[in-house]
From Swiss-Prot:
CDD domains attached to this UniProt entry: DEADc_DDX49, SF2_C_DEAD
Name this protein carries in UniProt: ATP-dependent RNA helicase dbp8
Source species of the chain: Aspergillus terreus (strain NIH 2624 / FGSC A1156)
Short motif (Q motif): ranges: 86-114
Stated family: Belongs to the DEAD box helicase family. DDX49/DBP8 subfamily.
Gene for this chain: dbp8
Motif DEAD box, chain ranges: 239-242
Basic and acidic residues bias spans: 1-16
Role summary: ATP-binding RNA helicase involved in 40S ribosomal subunit biogenesis and is required for the normal formation of 18S rRNAs through pre-rRNA processing at A0, A1 and A2 sites. Required for vegetative growth.
Length: 527
């Protein structure tokens, strides 16, 4: 490259024809000296050559790495690695995919991507566990697209995920990564008309991203012609596998089994499971009987420090939270929880932060949105009782910062990647510690800083202790310099203001009006 640069300079000085042509391009200038000085402007490629030339000339000075002062600890926390496979090229990713990822500003693979992509490309089944925000979607999307490009046909892959919003996010990522190719993904989720979805399935898209309930409906009711293409699927992904495979009330297992029954047997397809919490149900799949022709399952669990535990059969690692997350709690009386929340969101430190408030029940989320709206907060909501069109528009408003606060149930706790979120508030303490891990994972993503505040009542102490045992870290008591939440609630008119707003919100709900005061029919849950 250095020789090319020097030779181009010599050619420019030695070629008289080039020197005589250059002034003709700059007839706007009237002085010959100016023309001579700017006759050969430096093109962009020359700038890049100069940058590449510097390390060769100053090799001894730059060997210490002072140009990129990244500490080893910080690099591990970000899922980066200076030595070994620190690029997608080293993982044998196709050049067109590397270019597509670069366009998306994804230049270095994270720990879960480094561990899984080469093994998936080898054809191995995979169980991947890694903390939230670590790039699990790219870890399975890239090898799927690379293998599809080698033999594109019909429905190549099916991705199952528990929520509509996460399915939409995965669908958009597949479209973005596959932009240079003519890959056709299709989104199959509840809350929308089944007829266009059935038509799309019958036209043999390349990748199907679906929620289990809606895809099971199509398998059972849309006819053989619609789902015949599923019989040739090569790859299956269970994203948020712990939720998809969880037993008990509200389990998705029956729908997942219906979906898998329409696909080729496990011996004839590649199965990928990804989750932030590797549960016993997920880990047990490693020991299931396998065809002798298939390679062993690849199991990896990436801890928060970037270390890899491959093939582990013990308990799930506790360090599943990002190191940049600050965990705090705020003691609140059960009768004044709304007032404490209002003051917490209004402090100088929190007033400008995009925040997600998690509730255990849809009715609580609905009430909180109405109450906070009356208290002058820019707020929207996301829960299962809303029509799908409203869920999508509310989430879009929050992504675009038209609303600062999103009040949500656990439908928003998994997979949603909204980098601007700086604060997560657990209005209700989750009953399952794994749900806490997913909730607080909505902030402090990809190395950014974030805070999670849990409102703790008298009856929540045991739940908090279980959470601390699960994550291996203790929560600190919330504090902000010069702020006493309890003092502001007691000594100001907050209690009266919040009480009045709550009464108005309850009346609005009883009258069957939406958050804008418009009369509407009772909401029905759509599968």
């Amino acid at each position: 490259m250095e020789n090319d640069h020097s030779s181009s300079d010599e050619h420019e000085h030695e070629n008289p024809e080039l020197q005589t042509r250059a002034p003709k391009r700059r007839r706007l200038s009237e002085t010959s000296e100016d023309d001579e000085y700017v006759a050969a402007p430096t093109p962009l490629p020359t700038l890049s050559r100069i940058k590449k030339k510097e390390p060769k000339d100053e090799n001894k000075d730059t060997s210490t790495g002072t140009d990129n002062p990244v500490l080893i600890k910080d690099a591990l926390e970000m899922g980066l690695q200076d030595a070994g496979e620190s690029s997608f090229k080293a993982l044998n990713v196709a050049p067109w995919l590397i270019g597509s990822l670069t366009t998306m500003a994804v230049r270095k693979p994270t720990a879960i991507q480094r561990a899984c992509i080469p093994e998936i490309l080898k054809g191995r089944d995979c169980i991947g566990g890694s903390r939230t925000g670590s790039g699990k979607t790219i870890a399975f999307a890239v090898p799927i697209l690379q293998k599809w490009a080698e033999d594109p046909f019909g429905i190549f892959a099916v991705v199952l995920t528990p929520t509509r919003e996460l399915a939409l996010q995965i669908y958009e990522q597949f479209k973005a990564i596959s932009a240079p190719q003519s890959m056709k993904p299709v989104l199959i989720t509840g809350g929308t008309d089944m007829r266009p979805q059935a038509l799309a399935l019958s036209q043999r898209p390349h990748v199907v991203i679906a929620t289990p309930g809606r895809l099971a409906d199509h398998i059972q009711t849309s006819g053989e012609d619609t789902v015949r293409g599923l019989k040739r699927v090569r790859m299956v992904v269970l994203d948020e596998a712990d939720r998809l495979l969880a037993p008990g009330p509200g389990s998705m297992l029956p729908d997942v089994e219906t979906c898998l029954s329409a696909l080729p047997p496990s011996s004839e397809r590649q199965t990928l499971l990804f989750t932030a919490t590797v549960t016993p149900e997920v880990r047990a799949l490693k020991s299931m009987p396998r065809a002798s022709t298939k390679p062993p399952v690849f199991v990896t669990e990436i801890e928060a420090g970037g270390t890899t535990s491959a093939g582990a059969d013990g308990a799930a690692p506790k360090s599943t939270l990002p190191p940049t997350l600050k965990q705090t709690y705020l003691k609140v009386p059960m009768t004044h929880r709304e007032a404490f929340l209002h003051v917490l969101l209004s402090t100088d430190g929190n007033a400008g932060k995009p925040a997600i408030i998690f509730c255990n029940h849809t009715k609580t989320a609905d009430l909180l949105e109405r109450l906070l709206r009356r208290l002058a907060h820019r707020v929207t909501s996301l829960h299962s009782l809303l029509p799908q069109s409203e869920r999508s528009s509310n989430l879009a408003r929050f992504r675009a910062s038209a609303a600062r606060i999103l009040v949500a149930t656990d439908v928003a706790s998994r997979g949603l990647d909204i980098p601007s979120v700086a604060l997560v508030v657990n209005y209700d303490v989750p009953r399952n510690p794994d749900d806490y891990v997913h909730r607080v994972g909505r902030t402090a993503r990809a190395g950014r800083r974030g805070e999670a505040v849990t409102l703790v009542g008298q009856r929540d102490v045991q739940l908090v202790l279980a959470i601390e045992e699960r994550v291996g870290r203790q929560m600190e008591e919330w504090s902000e310099e010069g702020v006493s939440v309890e003092g502001r609630v007691v000594r100001t008119g907050v209690l009266k203001e919040v009480g009045s707003a709550k009464r108005e919100a309850l009346i609005e709900i009883e009258e069957g009006r939406d958050v804008l005061g418009r009369k509407r029919n009772k909401l029905k849950k759509v599968r």
